[in-house]
Amino acid sequence: MPGKSGLGWWWARLPLCLLLSLYGPWMPSSLGKPKGHPHMNSIRIDGDITLGGLFPVHGRGSEGKACGELKKEKGIHRLEAMLFALDRINNDPDLLPNITLGARILDTCSRDTHALEQSLTFVQALIEKDGTEVRCGSGGPPIITKPERVVGVIGASGSSVSIMVANILRLFKIPQISYASTAPDLSDNSRYDFFSRVVPSDTYQAQAMVDIVRALKWNYVSTVASEGSYGESGVEAFIQKSREDGGVCIAQSVKIPREPKAGEFDKIIRRLLETSNARAVIIFANEDDIRRVLEAARRANQTGHFFWMGSDSWGSKIAPVLHLEEVAEGAVTILPKRMSVRGFDRYFSSRTLDNNRRNIWFAEFWEDNFHCKLSRHALKKGSHVKKCTNRERIGQDSAYEQEGKVQFVIDAVYAMGHALHAMHRDLCPGRVGLCPRMDPVDGTQLLKYIRNVNFSGIAGNPVTFNENGDAPGRYDIYQYQLRNDSAEYKVIGSWTDHLHLRIERMHWPGSGQQLPRSICSLPCQPGERKKTVKGMPCCWHCEPCTGYQYQVDRYTCKTCPYDMRPTENRTGCRPIPIIKLEWDSPWAVLPLFLAVVGIAATLFVVITFVRYNDTPIVKASGRELSYVLLAGIFLCYATTFLMIAEPDLGTCSLRRIFLGLGMSISYAALLTKTNRIYRIFEQGKRSVSAPRFISPASQLAITFSLISLQLLGICVWFVVDPSHSVVDFQDQRTLDPRFARGVLKCDISDLSLICLLGYSMLLMVTCTVYAIKTRGVPETFNEAKPIGFTMYTTCIVWLAFIPIFFGTSQSADKLYIQTTTLTVSVSLSASVSLGMLYMPKVYIILFHPEQNVPKRKRSLKAVVTAATMSNKFTQKGNFRPNGEAKSELCENLEAPALATKQTYVTYTNHAI
């Protein structure tokens, strides 16, 4: 160490000198004090090496007072733990042999500013001026009590106190080991390089508390912190860890002032109630503030509403919850892993006023512990306080339970002792007592030895420090439980790098073992996505997945693939049911009935015509075209079975071919017939020569030519768009996915269907036009009128079909309605043709065979004459109103001679 007279040494300590000039009047000891004068504000134990001690013997004072009430456990127990450790080390022949450890122990009064004043005692020996030139009034030298040289400090308790003291001690390179300060700020080795601690940093504690919160499935909590380094840093570390791990949000973050005003704690409770869902409250506060928070909660009638989680400052202490058991019930607290030191229990229980005079506060403790007074003058008249007898015994006449930090106080003293022992072994090998290299002790060297210690603590736990002077994180987790009117802290788990929590051991007020809730929003139901509140990821609104959406994850709804629909709870997708028109469907009953009856009737007509093929009626109907027409009618009925059959490649191909082909065959045959009649009568108006292409062979050629156009179009369609079946999921994609269906059908769109039937419709319309034009032929040419009625009726059927078919395109039963409408319309069209053109003939053939005989024949000349005279005598009224020639004009000219002289075409009236 540089000489004290050096300029650099004084310059480095200039700030402290200024500080001392401010606090000089309040210095705990002053120069010139007579030797042996008792230090009433500190404990002084002589030794070869002196250790400082800082303990909160008293609480924080009020109304301008520095100190308040005595703290029995947190103050006296811890102080006695240091004395106990010093006794053990001094009596240990293997640890610091022939070297006695002394102590200078001060009371911090739980206040950082007061602790700063007291700690100046530790550096007093380093900055005192030499008093040899000072002379008393009598001329003699003054009697000076030289202050001891403190080489290391044990303490302090509160983090804010340790921070304040550490800022001074580092200037004089005095190592400091705390037994209770856990603020994360103290891990900053650049600012607090001479600070170490045998308790873990609140960084570990905060991580442990976050893990507990997550294990209890709480995601919305409030925090309460005492103003100062411990509380604020602890809460800050908790918030930081909760953000890093995610899943925990802070509802309120409340700070308790150092000097709270009246009603401050009631205000804190009201603020916590603003977010009533955040029932879990994380507390980083000193025990006085903890107690006042609990009292305020009781005043607000909120017993059982809040679930407290206290840091190690709460731990397993009785003082914060005394007479507040119901409010504190269920509180989860955390405490660095510790064990009760049995030797200390025996030591402390044996302390009396006689054998513990070195503890200047023990008498005050005695009075407080046994509720008595040592001085008779202190007794007030009428008071129930008795006089102390000095026969009281701790643990017998008063309750006793070892304070939680006793183990760490002892470990801190032993850490200093082991470091000094290692330092003495290296610097003074083989020397008994201190050697010049350790007189004085170099604080920088001592710090290195402190950071390198590794020994088993008083409870068997390893004591080590990391590069920042922190101890490893090891915690016990407690819950304050009320059982059968008795309260106790029960161990429910531990934390060493990761959490071990036995939830089954926990007990909650009002709900037993059921975990209480402290959440911002209730969990969303299956099929609902979370829409988080901005800046508060633990709060959300639940929005249901709608339509065809399903829940992908907690935050996303996604539309199912086109061929699927969401499950009932919308957590996935399932295939959309595929439907088709079944044979047993009610929609198929009528089409199948009409088709079966129609096919039977058609076959009956065909059989009848074949059997009576050579009779006049069959001949007169034009046998060739009649059979072609019957084939078309049969195909129209047969198409129903193709439309109801399950769609596949074969079925769809046959549908394309026969759906329009049957109608094309029917209307092509009818068109050929009406065209023949029309041409015959039109030709007869102009000349007596027969029109061309009226022979049966010509009629068949014309019919098949018309049919071939339909077949050609179908072939082109097959080439351009090969036939196949599809499942149409859009056809019945209802708003409610529960009713969605996929329709198995042939790949024939409505437009394709129009094109497919369009040619047949064109033939039908053309045939209808010719039927209108031939409505005036004579009654004897009796096929013209039935064909006309057939076409009129058919047009009506198809005019009704169009709005029904296309008007139901958006219906849920589109498949059934359109298929039924189409098949019924085709069957009705076939039935009209079959009924009007063939049933009368079959009736005559079967029931009136007497009419199935040849009638008078007419020549083409008679027809031409009738057609010519119809124009001539229209005004004379010799013709019927519809222009038909009177039957008297239609003589049957059968004379053979006449037939050989003139060119006539002979035919019967039914052959037209």
Swiss-Prot record:
PROSITE patterns xrefs: G_PROTEIN_RECEP_F3_1, G_PROTEIN_RECEP_F3_2, G_PROTEIN_RECEP_F3_3, G_PROTEIN_RECEP_F3_4
Task: Kindly list every residue the record annotates as glycosylated.
Answer: 98, 301, 454, 484, 569
Location of the protein in the cell:
Cell membrane
Keywords on record: Cell membrane, Disulfide bond, G-protein coupled receptor, Glycoprotein, Membrane, Receptor, Signal, Transducer, Transmembrane, Transmembrane helix
Give GO cellular component annotations, separated by semicolons: plasma membrane
**What ranges are annotated Extracellular (topological domains)?**
33-586, 646-653, 721-751, 808-826
The record's listing under InterPro entries reads: ANF_lig-bd_rcpt, GPCR_3, GPCR_3_9-Cys_dom, GPCR_3_9-Cys_sf, GPCR_3_C, GPCR_3_CS, GPCR_3_mGluR4, GPCR_3_mtglu_rcpt
Q: List the disulfide bonds.
A: 67-109, 249-538, 372-388, 428-435, 520-539, 524-542, 545-557, 560-573
Q: Please list the GO biological process terms of this entry.
A: adenylate cyclase-inhibiting G protein-coupled glutamate receptor signaling pathway
The region annotated as signal peptide is 1-32
Q: Where are the transmembrane segments?
A: 587-607, 625-645, 654-671, 700-720, 752-772, 787-807, 827-847
Entry keyword annotation includes Transmembrane helix: yes
Q: Does the keyword Thylakoid apply?
A: no
Q: Which GO terms describe its molecular function?
A: G protein-coupled receptor activity; glutamate receptor activity
Tell me the SUPFAM superfamilies matching this sequence.
Answer: Periplasmic binding protein-like I
Where does the chain bind L-glutamate?
159, 180-182, 230, 312, 405
Kindly report every residue range on the membrane side named Cytoplasmic.
608-624, 672-699, 773-786, 848-912
The record gives the membrane topology as: Multi-pass membrane protein
| Sequence similarity | Belongs to the G-protein coupled receptor 3 family.
Q: How does it assemble?
A: Interacts with PICK1.
Report the protein's function.
G-protein coupled receptor for glutamate. Ligand binding causes a conformation change that triggers signaling via guanine nucleotide-binding proteins (G proteins) and modulates the activity of down-stream effectors. Signaling inhibits adenylate cyclase activity.
- The molecule here is called Metabotropic glutamate receptor 4
From which organism does this entry originate?
Macaca fascicularis
Question: Source organism lineage?
Answer: Eukaryota, Metazoa, Chordata, Craniata, Vertebrata
Gene from which this protein is expressed: GRM4
